[in-house]
């Protein structure tokens, strides 16, 4: 009835003229209320460590034990890197955070719930690797901790974890039992009024004919994050009706004012808040349509209030891998450990190069199959690059990458210092981490500061980029940056390298994320090559509710001479 808003004192007086004492009492209560909202302090629960330990001591013990298990021999460089990461984590106040994540991942593995090898920038952390949070060696794949946690930029850590699609909820239930239902809640998201939708909504309120409004809405190009203003520039027909029809002009102007505003609420697919006290002590809560308790604040506001979001994601491919592994053991007696298969198996890599990658994670689209046929991957590093390059923008560099791979003599480095950084990607800047390494190795930046430069480039912050160009080329003694010229790189060459970085950085991909997903891609390719029947059975079971996909995979089985019962 249009009453969902906070009324002014005058409105309340008009509505309740007979209850002046009640109105006065609300004022007295308001005067007695006092609240202080604390920003910048994390509100994570303290992790329960064994008797005789502090959280810091326990984290150290777990990490150094994991270091011994992961590496032989343990070098001084490894110890230094681990100590550096641990110190950064302690200084930023996230010791308990890592223990909490370690604990629920351990629970999942102890209960035969498959966990992904990693996701996002967390795969660049040696601490995460030694704890078993991730399964990807950051040293071997040249992944950077500062891409995940930057000591020069205070930001929340963000460890997103993939679990078996069918059993993800079991892990969330474990966390609820451990920390309490009141301290573990899911997060609200707001669906916004997008270009087409807002025109339809406004048209309905203006009581315009549905067919007419639908025609107008369909004039907006189907492009990600399209706005009405951009559509007016892109579509002359849309602009013409806007300028010539007074009623449509009013419709579109009204829609433009409402565009981007929240339209409805839903629950974040994976985000969960874990807090030290009842979450209602910090933020307002509400009940979702399925009865779940959710925050009324989005994750951005929650982070500002010091509440850490953790993402528990369900990945269908992990369910496929786990079910295939169980079938292999059931049918053949072979107990596969997918973390310790050969990740440089020539037969598996060659199978990807044939383009027969139906059912292989991230590599089964028609375009990706063609790319793999051209690329002919010879290592996991090639698969990582393939996943990173096959996106709008970086696709423009695919011919250059393939040419460099097939004809190394065509690769030209602007200076010798670039070769060790760009050699794995045949002279192309493919990863965000490479931008950071170039800035560090050529101009003497710290890795923390180099991440700030990488962020400025990816967000096209012109003023910051120009300031950093001066620092990159000429140095900045006051800020401790030597610069390229001081390191023997000519001014013209340094400027060219900086220009190239700006071009590539717009599209460069997070290598840590690509590497983790390349591992999942390789695992599915391995199972498909060596255990095709079990893999295809698990794959088809995972899409049993999608008749089109089932039919597609039946055709794949026939091509592989696998009998369908």
Where are these regions (language model features)?
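Active-site or pore-adjacent capping/gating segments
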Residues: 1-51
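Noncatalytic, beta-rich nucleic-acid-contacting surfaces in large DNA/RNA-processing enzymes
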Residues: 1-6, 11, 15, 50-565
């Amino acid at each position: 009835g249009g009453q969902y808003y906070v009324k002014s004192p005058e409105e309340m007086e008009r509505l309740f003229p007979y209850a002046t004492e009640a109105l006065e009492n609300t004022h007295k209560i308001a005067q007695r209320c006092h609240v202080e909202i604390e920003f910048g302090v994390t509100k994570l629960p303290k992790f329960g460590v064994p008797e005789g330990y502090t959280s810091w001591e326990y984290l150290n013990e777990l990490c150094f034990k994991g270091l011994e298990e992961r590496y032989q021999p343990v070098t001084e460089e490894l110890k230094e890197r681990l100590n550096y990461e641990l110190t950064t984590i302690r200084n930023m106040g996230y010791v308990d955070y890592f223990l909490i994540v370690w604990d629920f991942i351990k629970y999942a593995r102890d209960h035969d719930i498959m966990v992904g090898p990693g996701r996002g920038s967390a795969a660049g952390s040696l601490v995460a690797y030694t704890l078993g949070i991730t399964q990807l060696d950051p040293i071997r794949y040249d992944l950077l901790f500062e891409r995940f946690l930057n000591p020069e930029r205070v930001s929340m850590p963000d460890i997103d974890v993939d679990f078996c699609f069918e059993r993800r909820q079991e892990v969330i239930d474990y966390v609820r039992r451990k920390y309490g239902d009141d301290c573990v809640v899911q997060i609200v998201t707001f669906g916004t009024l997008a270009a087409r939708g807002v025109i339809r909504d406004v048209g309905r309120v203006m009581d315009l004919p549905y067919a007419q409004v639908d025609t107008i809405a369909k004039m907006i190009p189907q492009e990600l994050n399209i706005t009405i203003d951009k559509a007016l520039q892109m579509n002359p027909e849309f602009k013409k009706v806007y300028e010539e029809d007074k009623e449509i002009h009013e419709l579109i102007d009204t829609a433009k004012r409402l565009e981007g505003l929240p339209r409805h609420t839903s629950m974040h697919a994976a985000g969960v808040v874990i807090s030290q006290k009842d979450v209602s002590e910090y933020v307002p809560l509400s009940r979702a349509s399925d009865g779940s308790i959710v925050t009324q604040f989005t994750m951005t506001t929650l982070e500002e209030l010091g509440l850490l979001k953790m993402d528990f994601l369900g990945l269908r491919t992990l369910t496929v891998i786990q079910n295939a592994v169980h079938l292999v053991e059931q049918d053949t007696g072979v107990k596969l450990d997918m973390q310790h298969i050969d990740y440089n198996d020539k037969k598996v890599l060659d199978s990807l190069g044939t383009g027969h990658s139906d059912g292989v994670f991230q590599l089964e689209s028609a375009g990706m199959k063609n790319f793999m046929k051209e690329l002919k991957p010879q290592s996991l590093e090639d698969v990582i690059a393939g996943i990173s390059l096959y996106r709008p923008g970086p696709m423009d560099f695919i011919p250059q990458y393939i040419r460099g791979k097939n004809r190394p003599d065509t690769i030209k480095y602007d200076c010798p210092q670039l070769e060790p950084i760009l050699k794995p990607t045949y002279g192309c800047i493919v990863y965000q981490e490479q931008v950071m390494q170039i800035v560090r190795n050529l101009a003497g930046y710290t890795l923390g500061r180099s991440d700030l430069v990488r962020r400025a480039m990816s967000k096209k912050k012109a003023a910051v980029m120009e300031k950093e160009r001066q620092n990159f080329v000429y140095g900045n003694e006051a800020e401790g940056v030597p610069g390229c010229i001081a390191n023997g790189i000519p001014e013209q060459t340094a400027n060219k390298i900086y220009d190239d970085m700006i071009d590539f950085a717009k599209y460069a991909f997070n290598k840590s994320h690509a590497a983790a997903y390349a591992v999942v891609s390789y695992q599915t390719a391995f199972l498909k090559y060596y255990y095709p029947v079990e893999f295809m059975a698990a794959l088809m079971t995972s899409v049993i509710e999608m008749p089109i996909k089932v039919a597609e995979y039946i055709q794949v089985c026939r091509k592989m001479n696998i009998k369908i019962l």
